Amino acid sequence: MNWLEENYKQENGLYSAPCASSTMFNSPRENVFYPIDFNSAMAINASYMSALGDILNDKDLSFKYKRLYFSIKTRINSLMWNNEENFYQDLDKDQNKLPVKTIAGFWPLLAEIPNADKAASLIEHLSNPKTFGTEHPFPTLSADDTHFSENGEGFCGSVFPIMNFMVIKGLEKYQYYELARECSIRHLYFILEGLMPNEQKQNGDLYEAYCPNKEGKATMASLPDFPRGHFLISAGLSTIALMIENVIGLSISLPRKTVDWIIPNLEIMGIENLSLKRNLITILSNKSSRGWEIQMESEKLYYFTINILDQKKKTLPIPSGKCSMLIDKL
Protein backbone atom coordinates (compact mmCIF):
# COMPACT_ATOMS: atom_id res chain seq x y z
CA MET A 1 0.00 0.00 0.00
CA ASN A 2 2.83 2.42 0.82
CA TRP A 3 4.46 1.82 -2.58
CA LEU A 4 1.16 2.45 -4.35
CA GLU A 5 0.66 5.62 -2.34
CA GLU A 6 4.11 6.92 -3.24
CA ASN A 7 3.91 6.10 -6.94
CA TYR A 8 0.28 6.58 -7.96
CA LYS A 9 -1.51 8.89 -5.53
CA GLN A 10 -2.11 12.42 -6.82
CA GLU A 11 -2.73 15.71 -5.02
CA ASN A 12 -6.52 15.37 -5.37
CA GLY A 13 -6.47 12.12 -3.37
CA LEU A 14 -7.19 9.85 -6.35
CA TYR A 15 -4.78 7.41 -7.95
CA SER A 16 -3.45 7.63 -11.48
CA ALA A 17 -2.42 4.35 -13.09
CA PRO A 18 -1.86 3.15 -16.66
CA CYS A 19 -5.01 1.85 -18.30
CA ALA A 20 -3.13 -1.41 -18.95
CA SER A 21 -3.28 -2.09 -15.21
CA SER A 22 -6.96 -2.96 -15.66
CA THR A 23 -6.07 -5.71 -18.23
CA MET A 24 -8.89 -4.30 -20.41
CA PHE A 25 -6.50 -4.19 -23.37
CA ASN A 26 -8.70 -2.66 -26.12
CA SER A 27 -11.38 -0.95 -24.05
CA PRO A 28 -12.20 2.52 -25.49
CA ARG A 29 -10.89 4.34 -22.43
CA GLU A 30 -8.56 6.70 -24.26
CA ASN A 31 -7.17 9.61 -22.25
CA VAL A 32 -7.97 7.94 -18.93
CA PHE A 33 -5.74 9.29 -16.16
CA TYR A 34 -7.78 8.34 -13.08
CA PRO A 35 -9.27 4.85 -13.67
CA ILE A 36 -12.43 4.12 -11.69
CA ASP A 37 -11.56 0.43 -11.28
CA PHE A 38 -8.05 1.08 -9.95
CA ASN A 39 -9.32 3.66 -7.46
CA SER A 40 -12.11 1.36 -6.31
CA ALA A 41 -9.59 -1.45 -5.86
CA MET A 42 -7.50 0.84 -3.69
CA ALA A 43 -10.57 1.51 -1.55
CA ILE A 44 -11.14 -2.24 -1.22
CA ASN A 45 -7.51 -2.75 -0.20
CA ALA A 46 -7.79 -0.04 2.45
CA SER A 47 -11.05 -1.48 3.76
CA TYR A 48 -9.59 -4.95 4.24
CA MET A 49 -6.37 -3.62 5.74
CA SER A 50 -8.54 -1.84 8.31
CA ALA A 51 -10.43 -5.07 8.97
CA LEU A 52 -7.13 -6.90 9.50
CA GLY A 53 -6.17 -4.22 11.99
CA ASP A 54 -9.38 -4.94 13.91
CA ILE A 55 -8.64 -8.67 13.93
CA LEU A 56 -5.10 -8.04 15.20
CA ASN A 57 -6.44 -5.55 17.76
CA ASP A 58 -4.12 -2.93 16.24
CA LYS A 59 -6.15 0.25 16.62
CA ASP A 60 -3.59 2.46 14.89
CA LEU A 61 -3.47 0.23 11.81
CA SER A 62 -7.25 -0.03 11.69
CA PHE A 63 -7.76 3.73 12.01
CA LYS A 64 -5.08 4.54 9.43
CA TYR A 65 -6.67 2.46 6.71
CA LYS A 66 -10.24 3.25 7.68
CA ARG A 67 -9.43 6.92 7.23
CA LEU A 68 -7.80 6.16 3.86
CA TYR A 69 -10.85 4.17 2.77
CA PHE A 70 -13.28 7.00 3.54
CA SER A 71 -10.95 9.50 1.89
CA ILE A 72 -10.95 7.52 -1.37
CA LYS A 73 -14.69 6.87 -1.10
CA THR A 74 -15.45 10.58 -0.71
CA ARG A 75 -13.33 11.54 -3.70
CA ILE A 76 -14.76 8.85 -5.95
CA ASN A 77 -18.31 9.94 -5.12
CA SER A 78 -17.59 13.64 -5.55
CA LEU A 79 -15.41 13.48 -8.67
CA MET A 80 -16.24 10.29 -10.59
CA TRP A 81 -20.03 9.95 -10.28
CA ASN A 82 -22.01 11.20 -13.30
CA ASN A 83 -25.48 12.34 -12.19
CA GLU A 84 -26.82 12.44 -15.75
CA GLU A 85 -25.71 8.92 -16.63
CA ASN A 86 -26.11 7.49 -13.11
CA PHE A 87 -22.71 5.90 -13.53
CA TYR A 88 -19.14 6.02 -12.26
CA GLN A 89 -16.71 7.09 -14.97
CA ASP A 90 -12.98 7.47 -15.54
CA LEU A 91 -11.40 10.92 -15.41
CA ASP A 92 -8.85 12.48 -17.73
CA LYS A 93 -5.82 14.43 -16.52
CA ASP A 94 -7.94 17.57 -16.05
CA GLN A 95 -10.47 15.63 -13.95
CA ASN A 96 -13.11 15.67 -16.70
CA LYS A 97 -15.36 12.63 -16.85
CA LEU A 98 -14.79 10.46 -19.92
CA PRO A 99 -18.07 9.73 -21.78
CA VAL A 100 -17.68 5.95 -21.82
CA LYS A 101 -19.55 3.43 -19.68
CA THR A 102 -17.54 0.26 -19.12
CA ILE A 103 -17.79 -2.68 -16.75
CA ALA A 104 -15.16 -0.88 -14.65
CA GLY A 105 -17.92 1.45 -13.46
CA PHE A 106 -19.36 -1.32 -11.27
CA TRP A 107 -16.22 -1.79 -9.16
CA PRO A 108 -17.51 0.82 -6.66
CA LEU A 109 -20.29 -1.61 -5.70
CA LEU A 110 -17.74 -4.15 -4.52
CA ALA A 111 -15.96 -1.38 -2.61
CA GLU A 112 -19.29 -0.27 -1.03
CA ILE A 113 -18.73 3.27 -2.25
CA PRO A 114 -22.21 4.43 -3.42
CA ASN A 115 -25.02 5.18 -0.98
CA ALA A 116 -28.30 3.29 -1.38
CA ASP A 117 -29.75 5.76 -3.90
CA LYS A 118 -26.67 5.84 -6.11
CA ALA A 119 -26.36 2.07 -5.91
CA ALA A 120 -29.97 1.61 -7.01
CA SER A 121 -29.46 3.95 -9.98
CA LEU A 122 -26.24 2.20 -10.95
CA ILE A 123 -27.75 -1.27 -10.62
CA GLU A 124 -30.64 -0.32 -12.92
CA HIS A 125 -28.13 -0.41 -15.78
CA LEU A 126 -27.72 -4.16 -15.22
CA SER A 127 -31.36 -4.72 -16.23
CA ASN A 128 -31.41 -2.16 -19.03
CA PRO A 129 -30.89 -3.84 -22.44
CA LYS A 130 -29.69 -0.52 -23.85
CA THR A 131 -26.67 -0.51 -21.53
CA PHE A 132 -25.60 -3.62 -19.57
CA GLY A 133 -28.75 -5.76 -19.47
CA THR A 134 -27.83 -8.00 -22.40
CA GLU A 135 -29.05 -11.58 -22.81
CA HIS A 136 -25.77 -12.85 -21.42
CA PRO A 137 -24.92 -10.57 -18.51
CA PHE A 138 -22.77 -8.45 -18.38
CA PRO A 139 -20.97 -6.87 -21.37
CA THR A 140 -17.70 -5.07 -20.72
CA LEU A 141 -18.93 -2.05 -22.68
CA SER A 142 -22.35 -0.41 -22.63
CA ALA A 143 -24.55 -1.56 -25.51
CA ASP A 144 -25.32 2.05 -26.46
CA ASP A 145 -21.65 2.84 -27.11
CA THR A 146 -20.54 3.26 -30.73
CA HIS A 147 -17.65 0.85 -30.12
CA PHE A 148 -19.95 -1.92 -28.85
CA SER A 149 -19.80 -5.17 -30.84
CA GLU A 150 -22.27 -8.06 -30.78
CA ASN A 151 -19.29 -10.35 -31.40
CA GLY A 152 -17.49 -9.04 -28.35
CA GLU A 153 -14.29 -7.77 -29.96
CA GLY A 154 -12.29 -8.06 -26.76
CA PHE A 155 -13.40 -5.48 -24.22
CA CYS A 156 -15.79 -3.82 -26.67
CA GLY A 157 -18.72 -5.94 -25.55
CA SER A 158 -17.47 -9.41 -24.61
CA VAL A 159 -18.70 -11.02 -21.40
CA PHE A 160 -15.77 -11.98 -19.18
CA PRO A 161 -16.63 -14.44 -16.37
CA ILE A 162 -14.15 -12.85 -14.00
CA MET A 163 -15.82 -9.45 -14.45
CA ASN A 164 -19.24 -11.02 -13.90
CA PHE A 165 -18.05 -12.40 -10.60
CA MET A 166 -17.02 -8.90 -9.52
CA VAL A 167 -20.42 -7.42 -10.44
CA ILE A 168 -22.41 -10.20 -8.77
CA LYS A 169 -20.42 -9.91 -5.55
CA GLY A 170 -21.05 -6.17 -5.69
CA LEU A 171 -24.79 -6.85 -5.88
CA GLU A 172 -24.48 -8.94 -2.73
CA LYS A 173 -22.99 -5.98 -0.86
CA TYR A 174 -26.30 -4.13 -1.36
CA GLN A 175 -28.54 -7.16 -0.72
CA TYR A 176 -29.69 -7.52 -4.34
CA TYR A 177 -29.73 -11.29 -3.85
CA GLU A 178 -32.53 -12.07 -6.29
CA LEU A 179 -30.91 -10.13 -9.14
CA ALA A 180 -27.54 -11.71 -8.34
CA ARG A 181 -29.12 -15.17 -8.48
CA GLU A 182 -31.00 -14.47 -11.72
CA CYS A 183 -27.88 -13.16 -13.45
CA SER A 184 -25.80 -16.06 -12.13
CA ILE A 185 -28.24 -18.58 -13.60
CA ARG A 186 -28.28 -16.81 -16.96
CA HIS A 187 -24.49 -16.60 -16.99
CA LEU A 188 -24.18 -20.30 -16.11
CA TYR A 189 -26.51 -21.19 -18.99
CA PHE A 190 -24.19 -19.55 -21.51
CA ILE A 191 -21.12 -21.13 -19.88
CA LEU A 192 -22.79 -24.55 -20.14
CA GLU A 193 -23.79 -23.95 -23.75
CA GLY A 194 -20.19 -23.10 -24.60
CA LEU A 195 -19.04 -26.27 -22.90
CA MET A 196 -21.67 -28.45 -24.61
CA PRO A 197 -22.72 -26.69 -27.85
CA ASN A 198 -25.82 -27.85 -29.73
CA GLU A 199 -23.92 -28.06 -33.00
CA GLN A 200 -22.21 -31.45 -32.97
CA LYS A 201 -19.42 -30.25 -35.29
CA GLN A 202 -18.21 -27.85 -32.62
CA ASN A 203 -16.03 -28.83 -29.69
CA GLY A 204 -17.07 -27.34 -26.37
CA ASP A 205 -14.73 -25.52 -24.02
CA LEU A 206 -14.51 -23.08 -21.14
CA TYR A 207 -13.67 -19.75 -22.73
CA GLU A 208 -12.09 -16.54 -21.58
CA ALA A 209 -14.98 -14.46 -22.99
CA TYR A 210 -18.44 -14.89 -24.50
CA CYS A 211 -20.85 -13.01 -26.76
CA PRO A 212 -23.26 -10.58 -25.05
CA ASN A 213 -26.49 -11.39 -26.90
CA LYS A 214 -26.06 -14.87 -28.35
CA GLU A 215 -24.66 -18.24 -27.44
CA GLY A 216 -21.02 -19.02 -28.03
CA LYS A 217 -17.58 -17.59 -27.50
CA ALA A 218 -16.69 -14.02 -28.36
CA THR A 219 -14.50 -13.24 -31.35
CA MET A 220 -12.01 -10.52 -32.26
CA ALA A 221 -11.07 -9.82 -35.87
CA SER A 222 -7.60 -8.48 -35.06
CA LEU A 223 -6.75 -11.26 -32.60
CA PRO A 224 -7.67 -14.74 -33.93
CA ASP A 225 -6.52 -16.47 -30.73
CA PHE A 226 -9.11 -14.54 -28.69
CA PRO A 227 -10.70 -15.80 -26.56
CA ARG A 228 -8.46 -18.39 -25.01
CA GLY A 229 -9.94 -21.82 -24.41
CA HIS A 230 -9.38 -24.07 -21.40
CA PHE A 231 -9.55 -20.85 -19.41
CA LEU A 232 -9.75 -22.46 -16.00
CA ILE A 233 -8.52 -19.32 -14.22
CA SER A 234 -12.08 -17.98 -14.03
CA ALA A 235 -14.04 -21.18 -14.70
CA GLY A 236 -14.22 -21.97 -10.99
CA LEU A 237 -15.69 -18.55 -10.26
CA SER A 238 -18.35 -18.91 -12.97
CA THR A 239 -19.30 -22.45 -12.06
CA ILE A 240 -18.47 -23.64 -8.57
CA ALA A 241 -18.49 -20.35 -6.65
CA LEU A 242 -21.59 -18.79 -8.24
CA MET A 243 -23.50 -22.08 -8.04
CA ILE A 244 -22.82 -22.51 -4.31
CA GLU A 245 -22.98 -18.89 -3.23
CA ASN A 246 -25.63 -17.36 -5.49
CA VAL A 247 -27.78 -20.04 -7.10
CA ILE A 248 -28.07 -22.18 -3.97
CA GLY A 249 -27.45 -19.17 -1.74
CA LEU A 250 -24.88 -20.43 0.78
CA SER A 251 -22.44 -18.03 2.44
CA ILE A 252 -19.64 -19.82 4.27
CA SER A 253 -17.19 -18.48 6.86
CA LEU A 254 -14.39 -20.88 7.77
CA PRO A 255 -12.93 -18.77 10.63
CA ARG A 256 -16.33 -18.43 12.31
CA LYS A 257 -17.45 -21.96 11.37
CA THR A 258 -20.76 -20.58 10.15
CA VAL A 259 -23.04 -21.18 7.18
CA ASP A 260 -25.70 -18.66 6.14
CA TRP A 261 -28.36 -19.86 3.72
CA ILE A 262 -30.51 -17.32 1.91
CA ILE A 263 -33.30 -19.38 0.33
CA PRO A 264 -34.84 -17.34 -2.51
CA ASN A 265 -37.67 -19.81 -3.14
CA LEU A 266 -38.79 -23.18 -1.88
CA GLU A 267 -37.45 -25.87 -4.18
CA ILE A 268 -35.39 -29.03 -3.96
CA MET A 269 -31.76 -27.94 -3.70
CA GLY A 270 -28.71 -27.98 -1.47
CA ILE A 271 -25.20 -29.36 -1.27
CA GLU A 272 -23.59 -32.58 -0.06
CA ASN A 273 -20.16 -33.10 1.52
CA LEU A 274 -19.20 -29.44 1.62
CA SER A 275 -15.88 -28.96 3.42
CA LEU A 276 -16.14 -26.55 6.36
CA LYS A 277 -12.68 -26.51 7.94
CA ARG A 278 -12.22 -30.27 8.44
CA ASN A 279 -15.94 -30.70 8.79
CA LEU A 280 -17.95 -32.23 5.95
CA ILE A 281 -21.53 -30.98 5.98
CA THR A 282 -24.65 -31.70 3.95
CA ILE A 283 -27.57 -29.27 3.70
CA LEU A 284 -30.62 -30.14 1.59
CA SER A 285 -34.11 -28.71 1.28
CA ASN A 286 -36.82 -31.17 0.30
CA LYS A 287 -40.57 -31.57 0.40
CA SER A 288 -41.90 -34.47 2.45
CA SER A 289 -45.34 -35.51 3.65
CA ARG A 290 -44.84 -33.13 6.59
CA GLY A 291 -44.07 -30.17 4.33
CA TRP A 292 -40.85 -28.42 3.36
CA GLU A 293 -37.94 -29.44 5.54
CA ILE A 294 -34.18 -28.98 5.70
CA GLN A 295 -32.11 -32.12 6.17
CA MET A 296 -28.60 -31.71 7.55
CA GLU A 297 -25.63 -33.89 8.34
CA SER A 298 -22.36 -32.83 9.95
CA GLU A 299 -19.24 -34.29 11.53
CA LYS A 300 -18.81 -31.43 14.01
CA LEU A 301 -20.76 -28.55 15.55
CA TYR A 302 -21.29 -25.43 13.43
CA TYR A 303 -23.70 -22.49 13.39
CA PHE A 304 -26.37 -22.27 10.73
CA THR A 305 -28.34 -19.13 9.83
CA ILE A 306 -31.32 -19.55 7.55
CA ASN A 307 -33.15 -16.73 5.79
CA ILE A 308 -36.29 -17.96 4.02
CA LEU A 309 -37.78 -15.74 1.33
CA ASP A 310 -36.61 -12.75 3.37
CA GLN A 311 -39.48 -13.47 5.79
CA LYS A 312 -38.01 -15.86 8.35
CA LYS A 313 -34.48 -15.67 9.74
CA LYS A 314 -33.02 -17.79 12.49
CA THR A 315 -29.57 -18.87 13.74
CA LEU A 316 -29.18 -22.35 15.24
CA PRO A 317 -26.28 -24.48 16.50
CA ILE A 318 -26.14 -27.65 14.40
CA PRO A 319 -24.71 -30.64 16.31
CA SER A 320 -22.74 -33.51 14.80
CA GLY A 321 -24.77 -36.27 13.19
CA LYS A 322 -28.03 -36.04 11.25
CA CYS A 323 -30.96 -33.75 11.92
CA SER A 324 -33.86 -32.08 10.13
CA MET A 325 -36.12 -29.10 10.67
CA LEU A 326 -39.52 -28.20 9.30
CA ILE A 327 -39.54 -24.77 7.68
CA ASP A 328 -43.08 -24.07 8.93
CA LYS A 329 -41.92 -24.60 12.52
CA LEU A 330 -39.04 -22.12 12.39
Positions of PLM-derived features:
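Non-catalytic C-terminal accessory modules of carbohydrate-active enzymes
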Residues: 124-134, 139-142, 153, 169, ...
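Extended glycan-interaction surfaces of carbohydrate-active proteins
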Residues: 2-34, 74-159, 192-224, 242-244, ...
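Intrinsic-disorder/low-complexity regions
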Residues: 38, 57-59, 89, 202-204, ...
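Alpha-helical scaffold segments in carbohydrate-active enzymes
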Residues: 2-10, 41, 48-51, 55, ...
